[in-house]
Amino acid sequence: MNRASGYLVWIAVALLGAFAFGTIALAHGERISALWIVIAAVCVYLIAYRFYSRFIASKVVQLDGLRMTPAVKYNDGLDYVPTNKYVLFGHHFAAIAGAGPLVGPVLAAQMGYTPGMLWILAGVVFAGAVQDFIVLFISTRRDGRSLGDLVKMELGTVPGVIALFGAFLIMVIILAVLALIVVKALTNSPWGTFTVAATIPIALFMGVYTRYIRPGRIGEVSIIGFVLLMASIAYGQHVHDSAALAAWFTFSGTQLTWILIGYGFVASVLPVWLLLAPRDYLSTFLKIGTIVGLAIGILIVAPELKMPALTKFVDGTGPVWSGNLFPFLFITIACGAVSGFHSLISSGTTPKLLDNETNARFIGYGAMLMESFVAIMALVAACVIEPGVYFAMNAPAAVLGTTPEAVAHTVTQWGFMLTPDMLTQMAKAVGETTIIARAGGAPTLAVGMAQILHQVIGGEAMMAFWYHFAILFEALFILTAVDAGTRAGRFMLQDLLGTFHPALKRTESLPANLTATALCVAAWGYFLYQGVVDPLGGINTLWPLFGISNQMLAAIALVLGTVVLFKMKRERYAWVTIVPTAWLLICTLTAGWQKVFDSNPKVSFLAHAAKLQAAAADGKVLAPAKSLAQMQRIIFNDYVDAALSALFILVVVSIAVYGVVAVVRARRAVQPTSRETPYEPMPVAPALGSGR
């Protein structure tokens, strides 16, 4: 009877999801409620976790709860610490969920809500969550090694060194981009800075509480942490309103850069149980709580999707970003569907904290589904805004114009209704002087969230509050990826340096830790600082590579997963990784080729550089440059980006080729050839999941 009722529940979930998808598909140009997207997404996630992740766990990788994990085996109180699965879920989710799921879907909305929705859902089920889960499994079975070191073990020394260099370079770009977004969000924002700063002492208290004061009392410390977090958010508004207090928490971009660099260094060196894990767990309360609250708000308000299902910009002529739907939609959405950055966390901090191998499914697959839900919420928030306002916020000023009248005229010509009064009223409602050309996706997400939440709590008078709350939410959301990413980067760099000097590979060595951390922080910190002081320098030079390099890293991780399955003699299930690997290789290599060699200056770095050079030769200055000197800087940036794109293509192709060779060898072998650490049974005591 219980089994029958269980099947009936899942049949009901499937039918509800099918009905939601049918409602979306049969809209025929009519506006529909955003709640159907939310319902469809939740049904997909529930079914995928219950059935597909269970299939992978039991058949493909065959998780073993009696096998000792690296956290239990090497429990050193620093990097290897058996951690309660709910705390670890919070840490892992906070670490992987950065800017991508917030910003990518917002930018993808220029093509309509349908393409983005379909890729976010299909991508996470069959690619993103699969990658995170399988890489976590592989690393856990190999003493928690980093991605590059895993490639070196399973594919060979040459591809391993290539992967180590390539992955670390991509990691530096990703961390610098994420850090720049945090700096921009917190500059001259005492409310946001105070609240983010307050999470540090709260996390330290939580770490000490669960390790020494009340070990294992996760429920207690969760309640305490949540109350303190809410108090810090509420008091942050008082800090903002007080001239005396605001002065203590108001920093320039340069000051915040140095603070962030210092924090990243400290967070990477301190024991993981003391700051990083509890702070990420704490941040997850706000992250998941806000997203769930937004979902409930959508169910209550049932706002209309004002963006069309498909816009005319699917042809690649969009003003927000250039490029055809294939392959650039998949590159733009990035982390909401699949992210290479996640593989660095799944092979970095998380496998060193996993208390039982069976929890890899909940943490690896489950946390990625949660991040995808964040992406769906971001897409919905962007699509409930009037399309005219959306394009006015996200298109560059050089295309739009600078006055409300000019912007309204330009956007109206694109086929979207917009008046100057709509722009001024929206800016006034959210407490901004202007919303024109607020590119990057984050302000648009904040406006969309405010439009939904103010209808649930507070009315029009609370519009500005919810807007600024959303900006704070985004900053805290992204910062957790910076500190965890720095620690993962330290592990990667130690593996890389250990290739040449084995002593530097020892994670328990303080000198090795300090050296690798200093080098990692210096790498992303340099690009961050230069990007803050120079709008055309530092990470601003490499920003266009963020999406494509991230997806290329995912392709490398999935190649590794495919090779390991063949070497484990699980080739009958290898389609689980082969399909997403092939798709990502096709997408990323096509996008990389077009970014280098396409003839369209709006797409190709080289074509854009040639266009600017021709204009400069005639003495003309083209936007966004304001002088011939700036034109030369942009031309230089284009050549740097083209060279790095070509380098990343070579890295991905070489890893793919070595992967094919490894698969052929594995098929010829009679016995499994994967290089797992020898099996050791889990100790009988102490009890697992103690929360330490």
How would you describe each model-predicted region?
Residues 22-28, 33, 79-142, 153-157, ...:
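Membrane-interface helix-loop-helix modules in multi-pass membrane proteins
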Residues 53-81, 107, 117, 121, ...:
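Flexible loop linkers connecting adjacent transmembrane helices
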Residues 298-314, 369-448, 484, 529-534:
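Extracellular/periplasmic helix-exit of transmembrane alpha-helices
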Residues 35-43, 47, 53-60, 166, ...:
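Membrane-interface loop-to-helix entry segments
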